[in-house]
């Protein structure tokens, strides 16, 4: 226990930087948020300005302290959570970035990943890093910068450049260039890290021609990395003490720290993580093997899967079909009918991800009869989010042999009670929605608070991780399996839809 009263979580996201101030009971006291510029130099390319990331993030830090009317000596520690994979390379001596940050969504390195596949590296990468070969991850982005920015490779080979994901950049800036670190969760997203030995992988560095001197030191997610001054020179020195990538921070914020515990974040898509304890499981279903935290913030493992289209399908009902005026209306229409009247919506607008991995699948509505109306289509669209979640969780359970204990949930769509109840019904497990919705920030705050003694241990936090509502499954097993079988049939018919057109 400490006389300090607050923890600050810096939540550096893809579209905005936020600072969240939490008290000793893990309540959100104040939030400051600033959006920053999305840069699209060409189709499929996405960049951020690293100096703007830092400017927005540091200003929210000062702003949240000012808004709450507190002094900086009341702050115990700062924790950081961040958009993962986004890649920054800067000069060691000046701290000046040599290029914009290349964002996780950016597809510019597709030709590099194609070559990795053609050269037969796919299996090695999967077995060593836990990842699939895709432009999403940091390694090929670093290579692109070294190959395409004038003078960058020569400087890197002389030891003059540093690489970091966004967490590393923020810690570097917060500590005035004294500390160059990352944590295990972020390192596991680079495609340069051996998740079994927990070391940077020499063979991957050789394949991508990246000098080892650029890489940060990898540390636990809960420890003191350095100090920062709030309010410039002569200000109070505050420990920077927790780091985790956004999805792993959310897993920790839900207190999912043991094998068999899982969370799903419902946003535009869904991000699911299932904790697998000290076992790194190689998926047979195209899921990622990634590093997550145990109770002490030390590295253990998780399986990660994502659904491409979740909340985006409700936006489609609103913006394209115009059958709901507002996303919130979807619950009202869905509950006007007792079932979907045999209608299934497969929202494969951009293909299907895990466990199907079919880029040629396309969206479809099946089972329409003359009696099908707006309510049935809205309901079937919401149901598709729950069905896709079951698809991924079944793949996770078959890979891991872990039986899901319960599902913790966060993200915008969790406010939809119909969807949460249907999710519980179709999974046959309890779905738990927390009181504090800022779960990602909570995870970073917990990691920082435990490192500095603000909280004693995770048991102290369990009382604070309050569940706002538990959705318990309907016990009708026959109905559950009949509905899911219908979904599988609908998916099967939407697969490879666009393929014939290209032949």
From Swiss-Prot:
GO MF terms held by the record: ATP binding; glycerol kinase activity
GO biological process: glycerol catabolic process; glycerol metabolic process; glycerol-3-phosphate metabolic process
Reactions mediated catalytically: glycerol + ATP = sn-glycerol 3-phosphate + ADP + H(+)
Binding site for glycerol: 84-85, 136, 246-247
A Pfam cross-reference name: FGGY_N
Function: Key enzyme in the regulation of glycerol uptake and metabolism. Catalyzes the phosphorylation of glycerol to yield sn-glycerol 3-phosphate.
Protein family membership: Belongs to the FGGY kinase family.
Protein known as: Glycerol kinase
Organismal lineage: Bacteria, Pseudomonadati, Pseudomonadota, Gammaproteobacteria, Pasteurellales
Gene that encodes the chain: glpK
């Amino acid at each position: 226990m400490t006389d300090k009263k607050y923890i600050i979580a810096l939540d550096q996201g893809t579209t905005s930087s936020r600072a969240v101030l939490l008290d000793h009971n893990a309540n959100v006291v104040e939030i400051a948020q600033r959006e920053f510029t999305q840069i699209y130099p060409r189709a499929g390319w996405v960049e951020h300005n690293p100096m703007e990331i830092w400017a927005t993030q540091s200003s929210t830090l000062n702003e949240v302290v000012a808004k709450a009317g507190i002094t900086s000596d009341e702050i115990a520690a700062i924790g950081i959570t961040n958009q993962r994979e986004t890649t920054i390379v800067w000069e060691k001596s000046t701290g000046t970035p040599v290029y914009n940050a290349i964002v996780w969504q950016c597809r510019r390195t597709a030709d590099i990943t194609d070559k990795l596949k053609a050269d037969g590296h796919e299996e090695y990468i999967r077995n060593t890093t836990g990842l699939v070969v895709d432009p999403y991850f940091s390694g090929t982005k670093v290579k692109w910068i070294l190959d395409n920015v004038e003078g960058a490779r020569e400087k890197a080979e002389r030891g003059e450049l540093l690489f970091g994901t966004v967490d590393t950049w923020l810690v570097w800036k917060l500590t005035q260039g004294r500390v160059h670190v990352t944590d295990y969760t972020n390192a596991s997203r680079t495609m340069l890290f051996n998740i079994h030995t927990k070391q940077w992988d020499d063979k991957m560095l050789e394949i991508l021609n990246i000098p080892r001197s650029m890489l940060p030191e990898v540390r636990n997610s809960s420890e003191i990395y350095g100090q920062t001054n709030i309010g410039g020179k002569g200000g109070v020195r505050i420990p920077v003490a927790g780091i985790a990538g956004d999805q792993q921070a959310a897993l920790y914020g839900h207190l999912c720290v043991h094998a068999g515990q899982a969370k799903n974040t419902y946003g535009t898509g869904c991000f699911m993580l299932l904790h697998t304890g000290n076992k790194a499981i190689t998926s047979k279903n195209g899921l990622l093997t990634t590093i997550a935290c145990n109770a002490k913030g030390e590295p253990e493992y998780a399986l990660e899967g994502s659904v491409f289209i979740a909340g985006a399908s409700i936006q489609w009902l609103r913006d394209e079909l115009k059958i709901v005026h507002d996303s919130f209306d979807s619950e009202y229409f869905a509950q006007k009918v007792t079932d979907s009247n045999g209608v299934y919506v497969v929202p494969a607008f951009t293909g299907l991800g895990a466990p199907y991995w079919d880029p040629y699948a396309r969206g479809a509505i099946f089972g329409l009869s003359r009696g099908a109306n707006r309510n049935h289509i809205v309901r079937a669209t919401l149901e598709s989010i729950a069905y896709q979640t079951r698809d991924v969780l079944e793949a996770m359970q078959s890979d891991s042999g872990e039986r899901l204990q319960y599902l913790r949930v966060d993200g915008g769509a969790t406010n939809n009670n119909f969807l949460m109840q249907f999710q519980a019904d179709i999974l046959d497990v309890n779905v738990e929605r927390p009181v504090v919705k800022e779960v990602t920030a909570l995870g970073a705050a917990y990691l920082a608070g435990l490192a500095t003694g603000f909280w004693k241990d995770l048991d102290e936090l369990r009382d604070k991780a309050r569940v706002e509502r538990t959705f318990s499954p309907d016990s009708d097993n026959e109905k559950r399996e009949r509905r899911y079988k219908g979904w599988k049939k609908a998916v099967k018919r939407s697969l490879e839809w666009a393929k014939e057109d290209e032949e």
